Amino acid sequence: MRRLGWLLLVGGLAPAFAQDESAGPPEKPHPAMMAPLAAKRTLIGISEVGSKLIAVGDRGHILSSADGKDWQQVPSPADVMLNRVRFRDDKTGFALGHDATILATRDGGASWTVAHFDATSRTLYDLAFLDDQHLIAIGGYGTFLDSADGGATWAPRDFPIGALGQHFSAVTKLADGSLLVAGEKGLLMRSKDQGANWELLDSPYTGSFFGVLPHGDKGAIVFGLRGNVFVADDVSKCPTLKVDGYDPYAREPILDPAKIAALGWRVVATPTRESLFGGARSDAGAVLVGVNGTVVKLDAAATAASTPRAPDGDTLADVIFRNGHWLAVGRRGATDLGAL
């Protein structure tokens, strides 16, 4: 399933206009409309840059805030749904979303330009910086884009795992420098050489993952459908699978904790069955957010989970830790979760 398909259901989203199919797909996106209530509409991604916050979401909206309470809309050159925003430093960042849209900023989010757009291509869900010049973007149905010039231009890359057609939902760089991608039907793939080559991991789960966080020196936390959370303390020790002949739809669920441990993972029992879409870490642990306003807190060792806040019914998509507070974004804009 698509990582953000839930938004089409809970948000009641519809196209801003009907397009004449005979005209073919547009060659460039339409600019997003400046909307007085943009801060109250669906926001899906949030990131900190310098002393401010940038959030992105429905209809290409990009918003900026100094305190997480008062938000101002920033002109956006694309009116497509934006799923994620990432910054390399205090100046350079990227927002990405539907129609393989990638927007770039070189001034800390004050202004944005179109770096990539293809109305015939798939939705993009996440992005990672490999170094100052090399970036990757991932998305639906195995979509994988490379940039070797700091994000100025992007090119698709085909490789065996991508050919499986599973959605790539999230990517992160672990503390040891390796990369981990999580996605549909339990997909986990790892790169030890800055994204040049990828290995398919033998996954402990057959449902979809929507997020991944670094954990410790070599580990990771992956989370997703129905509140499932798995932790590996050393991803480099997780066994791999051959891609040739692999069928993700033929896998049987693994219920035995010993078999899950043999794959290098352990289950974190969470007090929810709601799907979890976004997460962030602090020194005290991690916070994951999801359907119906669900908030799950993990301790620093990622061994125990709790729900420090009652769900309020409004789905949350992403969260960030800043100045001692957790700030989430979702169906009704930004929500201050407090210190938790």
What are these regions (language model features)?
Residues M1-L4:
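Positively charged n-region of N-terminal signal peptides that target proteins for export
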Residues V10-A18:
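Hydrophobic h-region of N-terminal signal peptides that target proteins for export
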Residues F17-L340:
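Residue-level hotspots at or immediately adjacent to binding/recognition sites across diverse folds
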